[in-house]
Swiss-Prot record:
Its EC number is 6.1.1.19. The keyword 4Fe-4S does not apply. It comes from the Bacteria. This is Arginine--tRNA ligase.
Amino acid sequence: MTPDELSVALTACLKAAVEAGELVVPTEAVPAEVRVERPKNRDHGDWATNIALQLAKPAGLNPRAVAEILKSRLEAIEGVAAVDIAGPGFLNITLDAAAAGALAKNIVHAGSQYGENQALTGQVINVEFVSANPTGPLHLAHTRWAAVGDSVARLLKASGATVTSEYYINDAGSQMNNFGASVLAAIKGEPTPEGGYPGAYITELAQQVVRDHPYVTELTDEAALPVVRAAAYLAQLADIKETLNDFGVHFDVFFSEQELHSTGAVEKAVDRLRGQGHVFYQDGAIWLRTTDFTDDKDRVLIRANGEPTYFAADAAYYLSKKDRGFVEKIYLLGADHHGYIGRLKAIAACAGDDPARNIEVLIGQMVSVNGARLSKRAGNIVELRDLLNWLGADALRYSLGRSPADSPLALEPEQLQKASNDNPVFYVQYAHARTKAVDRNAEAAGVDRSAFEASLLTHPTESNLLAQLGAFPSVVAEAAKFREPHRVARHLEVVAGTYHRWYDACRVTPFAGEEITDLNRTRLWLNDATGQVLANGLDLLGVSAPERM
């Protein structure tokens, strides 16, 4: 029996008690779901709930009296061995060994789908992250949201949501002209222009542009600039996509800002916002009255010279997401974009949406890497490509995903490269590799999964391991709900530690000369269930699950 199954049974007991008149409480006081938690002291049972304390006041009863009503119904559930009332009214539930152990077989049968849930079924969500300017290589500032954003999207999908991962390409505006001018200057052997982009990567782009378009060297600057800008942009965007792919980060859509301008979407967005009654004219410019919706100041949409602002493109982009059917739009932004929260929520409100429901802005803090070398190729930055070559995608993805994104993070490369238990990614991956080693040893010894007797899994380390495996779907659901992949990483570390202790205490393969029993076969199921949970969790974090280490 999984914690979720027990939760369903407990919820049914509560509703039955209310329907039978044993508990008289207002309808709104009855929770849709009664959750169970692992007690800190295992002497207090396998699972515990404080539902009796929650319902005592609306029921007008002592918490222990509420607990007594639920206790009698819980004891009748198949698989529940005992129910005890502790303290002011906590319900401590002990499962019989067969009910607890059956989980191992269920996990193996579920395979890669174990941990998936329907908590967000029906939600259509757009997750936008990274969205770095296509004027240079990805660097350290982009790494955290690349890792976290991809994992958030995976978690949302695992919880039943329909999710689109999106990268907004800032390919419009003066920065693109400066970028193109920088590459053109490199082609001509001239210094970087004022406001341009330095670095060896510009020279590399210049060489590639000349290889692909040799005729540009014969054009005037005016004629060459648009050709060079377009070619260099495509080459740099291809480099960004390749780096993201090597980092294990997937995007469904790369959305061009320039397309908003070329298709007239920006002008149409201004007209739509005008129709909502929030546009006004001042000093020859067109403004959006965002202060009506908690923004700190009103924002210019169209300058007095007729040029749209970047904010106008932001508004058009939001409306594009809305028109494409995304009910919830999640933006993952760096700490330097904190001021965007108010203006983005104001856009949503001006568009007739509910900022509390239709838009969510997550702010991440900066990451530093001790000992990281600045890129000579890209100037005064640490390139993501260099970090991948140095630390590897797995170590980088896991270390970025295991800490809350809203806290500053300093990575220690020396620790991430250690093959020891104080390296979290090694610790978890090694646990998975160990489950595969047990599989190989079991096969060599003739132990298979031809029998399964859940009631044999009675060792304390087995009940502990089963409890952690059973908690995995709830951890996934909570991580998706709060957009916090680190919850999965930290749980995997608990699973790994619990598994290692079980491995030390319980043998799957018998000693030489000993008979193979159903206990050996059943423990193989538990071993494989653990490997499946570790693999599924690592996949949610974008990290590989090696079979050998």
